[in-house]
Swiss-Prot record:
Source superkingdom: Bacteria
Entry EC number(s): 4.4.1.21
Lineage: Bacteria, Pseudomonadati, Pseudomonadota, Gammaproteobacteria, Enterobacterales
Assembly and interaction partners: Homodimer.
Family according to the record: Belongs to the LuxS family.
Name of the encoding gene: luxS
Name recorded for this polypeptide: S-ribosylhomocysteine lyase
Keywords, in A-Z order: Autoinducer synthesis, Iron, Lyase, Metal-binding, Quorum sensing
Catalytic activity entry: S-(5-deoxy-D-ribos-5-yl)-L-homocysteine = (S)-4,5-dihydroxypentane-2,3-dione + L-homocysteine
Matches recorded under Gene3D superfamilies: S-ribosylhomocysteinase (LuxS)
Biological processes annotated in GO: quorum sensing
Length: 171
């Protein structure tokens, strides 16, 4: 099985909250697709609660588009990580990390403005696979956590696992 890019960085040195360019690629038509690691929690030390991350998934996708789309950028998808420490965001374009961090903080402010559970988009049996597994309160706790701590930048060079370590881990 090939080693995925996300597993070539040292999660023990990863800071959170922080933005990291996880991958950049070009399509056959010349568009640049950038994948960002939006790390909400320090790996192996913190984790987002399942109801909170699910609600955040519904809110974050729209709010990030409100703040980041335009000027050569269009979000394709924002999806939670299985480890529940962050989200991956794929987009067309190459915004710098600070632009992404600013949009992320603004989106978290928007999450705090949601007044009631019934304002969560697509919260129904037809549009959500587990529509009863939501918590606006938990999503807002996550948003407050991001706003209070601020958003930094994780560098791939600083986090890269040495080839020797990768070989040792995959014997």
């Amino acid at each position: 099985m090939p080693l995925l890019d996300s597993f070539t960085v040292d999660h023990t040195r990863m800071e959170a909250p922080a933005v990291r360019v996880a991958k950049t690629m070009n399509t056959p038509h010349g568009d640049t697709i950038t994948v960002f690691d939006l790390r909400f929690c320090v790996p192996n030390k913190e984790v987002m609660p399942e109801k909170g991350i699910h609600t955040l998934e519904h809110l974050f996708a729209g709010f990030m588009r409100d703040h980041l789309n335009g000027n050569g950028v269009e979000i394709i998808d924002i999806s939670p990580m299985g480890c529940r420490t962050g989200f991956y965001m794929s987009l067309i374009g190459q915004p710098d990390e600070q632009r992404v961090a600013d949009a992320w903080k603004a989106a978290m402010q928007d999450v705090l403005k949601v007044k009631a559970q019934n304002q969560i988009p697509e919260l129904n049996v037809y549009q959500c696979g587990t529509y009863e597994m939501h918590s606006l309160e938990e999503a807002q706790e996550i948003a407050r956590h991001i706003i209070e701590r601020g958003v930094g930048v994780n560098s791939n060079d600083a986090l890269a696992l040495p080839k020797e370590k990768l070989q040792e881990l995959h014997l």
